[in-house]
Amino acid sequence: MGEENQPNYTISQENWSLHRKGYDDQQRHQEKVQEAIKNNLPDLVTEESIVMSNGKDVVKIPIRSLDEYKIRYNYDKNKHVGQGNGDSKVGDVVARDGSGGQKQKGPGKGQGAGDAAGEDYYEAEVSILELEQAFFRELELPNLKRKEIDENRIEHVEFNDIRKTGLWGNIDKKRTMISAYKRNAMRGKASFHPIHQEDLKFRTWNEVLKPDSKAVVLAMMDTSGSMGMWEKYMARSFFFWMTRFLRTKYETVDIEFIAHHTEAKVVTEEEFFSKGESGGTICSSVYKKALELIDNKYSPDRYNIYPFHFSDGDNLTSDNARCVKLVEELMKKCNMFGYGEVNQYNRHSTLMSAYKNIKDENFRYYILKQKADVFHAMKSFFREESGEKMA
């Protein structure tokens, strides 16, 4: 073969699966991030970067159970043989290097300077939507009942009827072609053409109306002087996730924000989450305000009513009996009453000691001692009722 006949190209063979390795590793890492988020939800939901965000941004949150990906050199260079349990995947850590012959020092904590290395953690970029999907999956308003309906809400449109006339945009091509084929076949010519006016089929729609039961949540928070920065942060963290949960899963839920010290007043959402106050504590004032709102604005015949009160439990002792009486009065008009107490050091609570005598099954309480308890309080108050679904 002469030089003029030599091909001007070469054929090479390559393992193209290697080109996907970077993509596969990235996908595996994202799966591990999602798994870490799910396993660390109780700690993540109270991250300040999330609670103080506008709820729409992607935020960076620390995930301490996930190492940042990087290339590691094996200084121990020995060959190891081991046996797994059968469910490991590529990239999983199956063992830790135990060399060194002595117990490893942990990272220091508390006061004073230490000589041990700190604990590294991975900062993952997570959208609020991702956290919501993992958090809200098993939550619902308890004891939700069908109430008097003011108006029906259009749920969706169904094309469930066929007619011979209609809008050209709604023509049913398949039925039109079948009709033409049958008519032509009866005349001895099995063909889709020609199509006559009598072959035309149009889809028509009906609006499916879904009656929707209304609900109102009364968010009540103690803003007195005994509620320190940590107590207010915990209460606001709970109400932050509560409002997002309600607005994500329910279309017709009103939320009223009530702040109190010795007096109670209805405030805006912005004031509720940002404004600080001081003074003494008379919790009965907030229950009176809640009853006033129900009587003037939210009839129990038309609304499912859910009051939630958060406090540190430090109430005027002489006011406790009045509080119990008002809570019992509220429960007669409400689907459920929730009381959350922020009590980090397990100190004596005048309010909780009175509420423990309430035996009504619609009264729920939760004592929050650490940040992770915001997650558990949400799970406790909004747990799914397996036997009770709204008809």
Curated annotation (Swiss-Prot):
Residues 98-115 have a biased composition (Gly residues). Residues 1-31, 80-117 are annotated as: Disordered. InterPro entries: Spore_YhbH, UPF0229. Residues 21-31 have a biased composition (Basic and acidic residues). Residues 1-16 have a biased composition (Polar residues). Coiled coil: none annotated. It comes from the Bacteria. Belongs to the UPF0229 family. This is UPF0229 protein BCG9842_B4751.
